[in-house]
Each structure stands twice: as C-alpha cells, then as structure tokens.
C-alpha cells in the first residue's frame, strides 16, 4: 500500500498517539545517503508508554522498524511499508547510575554517551565516539570499532517488543555475535545500561581524540555515506578484498566506492538507492570472483523497490 493510499485508512487502522505520527514521511532527509523513498508512517513517540501503547494496539500484521541516525542504512526507492519508529529527544538522555555505569536512552548518540562518560570519569566506552549512530542501533547491531564492541560494555538493554510488551534483556539474552543480535523483528531498543571502568577524564578525552583523528585520516567523514558497507570476513579485512578486486573508485550513476576507504560507498550527488545497492552488489560479485570470499552486507537495506 502506498503512503498516499494508506493515509485515508489511519482512523480505523492506527491507534491514537501522544507523539507525532506522519503519513508518507520522506526518509531521504533522515538518512546519511540522502536517498530512498518514504515511510508509510513515521512515528516519533512522546515517551516509552506512548510507544508501548501504540504497538500493543497496532494490527500485528503491520511491520515495524526502528530508525536512529540513519547512518548504516539504505532505504530503497519504493519506501518502507508499515511504521518506522524514530526516537527523538525524550529518548536521548544519558545519566550516571554509579561510578562506572551509565543508563542511556535509545536515541542518544555515541558522541553524547562517550562525552558523558568522560565527564563522569568513566573509561571503556570511548569507541562509541567513532560510531555514527544511536544507542538503539548499537545495541541491535552489536556496534563496534577500534577493537571494542557493545557486548564488551553492555549490562542490559530495555526494549519494547512488537507486541508492546516492555522487557529488560540481559547481555546473554541478546545473543550477540559479530554485528548481530538476537533481538526479535519489530523490537525497539529504548534504553541500555553500559558499564566501563574508572578513568581520569583527561585520559578518556585523549583516547577519544586519538580515535577521532584516526577516523578523520582514514574515512570519508564529510560525505553522503553509510559507514562500513561490508562485514569483515573471518581472517580478512573487507576493504582489502574490495581494493584487490579493483573496486576502489568504482561508480554506478552517482554512487561510488570511496577512493579514501573502499569499504565505504558514497552518494556523490543524485544517486538513487538502487544505484547504491546495485554498486554494492557489483562489488560483492567482483570480490567473489577475485578472491572466492563472499562479502556480507553490514549496511542494513530496508523497504521495497518501486
């Protein structure tokens, strides 16, 4: 069902909310690639109760997905059916629970988490400074960088299931593997508790600065990109395989494999999501032909083609 067609069905099919519910909401402005179609519905809940009540009353057949900063995401050009949930300011708070522990809202950015940890004298979460996303995405994906992953610091995650049920999941229950969790389809991460270690703020800041400088030197940070495109296969670096297959700088329309870091795809201007995803698939084919390794997407691809 198209967003335009679905708007007339709202009174009978979608529950009332206290937050904001928008029909046919363009998603391209909300994702880093600046491409893709619209959400059939975009829901920005007022608080956890608003989200829980909405999902509990929503027809179970309606698909639901969460959207953070949109940094590791391709939204296909036909848009996303169902409801896209975006956690705003009410979910972006970070608070210190004790000398080494933070409780972070699902909409809080990695920079906010690491900066709050620094100010509180908590080390160990500096790596979140380097991941362009929100806590909800980190927890779902077991986000990681510079030798650390969310599983190394997570105590528990607070989620609202597709049914509207609120659950607190332990580290073990999240079933983490490399860039993957056992979170069920449609579950929205609303908060997480991270535990680090006591550290002088100046030491934490120095590590954050080191990470920032390394990213600046090696990644196309000021581009329309989706971050790391492919997972690192066992025993390999994805970028090296892409480079060895002759894909550095490869283009399709306005989509390009970054020349600075070839595990990044770029939108040079007016690339469609089909251009970007198609370029990624071409890279996978070339790498398979060259090295025999099948690259697995790290970027999430959602929605439908036109």
From Swiss-Prot:
Catalytic activity reported: UDP-N-acetyl-alpha-D-muramate + NADP(+) = UDP-N-acetyl-3-O-(1-carboxyvinyl)-alpha-D-glucosamine + NADPH + H(+)
Pathway: Cell wall biogenesis; peptidoglycan biosynthesis
One Pfam family hit: FAD_binding_4
Biased composition (Polar residues): 220-232
Record keywords: Cell cycle, Cell division, Cell shape, Cell wall biogenesis/degradation, Cytoplasm, FAD, Flavoprotein, NADP, Oxidoreductase, Peptidoglycan synthesis
GO biological process: cell division; cell wall organization; peptidoglycan biosynthetic process; regulation of cell shape
Enzyme Commission number(s) from the entry: 1.3.1.98
Segments forming domain FAD-binding PCMH-type: 34-199
Required co-factors: FAD
Main location: cytoplasm
Protein purpose: Cell wall formation.
Family the entry assigns: Belongs to the MurB family.
Protein name: UDP-N-acetylenolpyruvoylglucosamine reductase
Upper taxonomic lineage: Bacteria, Pseudomonadati, Pseudomonadota, Alphaproteobacteria, Sphingomonadales
Gene: murB
């Amino acid at each position: 069902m198209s967003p335009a067609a679905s708007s007339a069905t709202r009174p009978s099919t979608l529950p009332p909310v206290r937050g904001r519910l928008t029909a046919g909401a363009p998603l391209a402005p909300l994702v880093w690639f600046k491409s893709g179609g619209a959400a059939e519905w975009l829901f920005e809940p007022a608080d956890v109760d608003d989200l829980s009540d909405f999902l509990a009353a929503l027809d179970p057949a309606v698909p639901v997905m969460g959207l953070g900063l949109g940094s590791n995401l391709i939204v296909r050009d036909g848009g996303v059916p169902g409801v896209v949930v975006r956690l705003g300011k009410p979910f972006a708070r970070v608070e210190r629970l004790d000398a080494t522990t933070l409780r972070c809202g699902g909409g809080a950015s990695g920079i906010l988490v690491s900066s709050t940890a620094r100010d509180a004298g908590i080390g160990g979460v500096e790596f979140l400074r380097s991941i362009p996303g929100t806590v909800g995405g980190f927890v779902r994906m077991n986000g990681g960088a510079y030798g650390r992953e969310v599983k190394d610091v997570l105590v528990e995650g607070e989620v609202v299931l597709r049914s509207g049920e609120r659950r607190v999941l332990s580290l073990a229950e999240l079933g983490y593997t490399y860039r993957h969790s056992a979170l069920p389809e449609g579950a929205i991460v609303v908060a997480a508790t991270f535990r680090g270690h006591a550290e002088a703020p100046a030491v934490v800041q120095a590590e954050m600065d080191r990470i920032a400088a390394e990213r600046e030197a090696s990644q196309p940070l000021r581009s329309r990109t989706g971050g790391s495109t492919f997972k690192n296969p066992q025993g390999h670096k994805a970028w090296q395989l892409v480079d060895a297959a002759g894909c550095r700088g490869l283009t399709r329309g306005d989509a390009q494999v970054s020349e600075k870091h070839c595990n990044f795809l770029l939108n040079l201007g007016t690339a469609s999501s089909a251009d970007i995803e198609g370029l990624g698939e071409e890279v996978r084919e070339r790498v398979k032909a060259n090295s025999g390794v099948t690259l697995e997407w790290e970027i999430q691809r959602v929605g439908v083609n036109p």
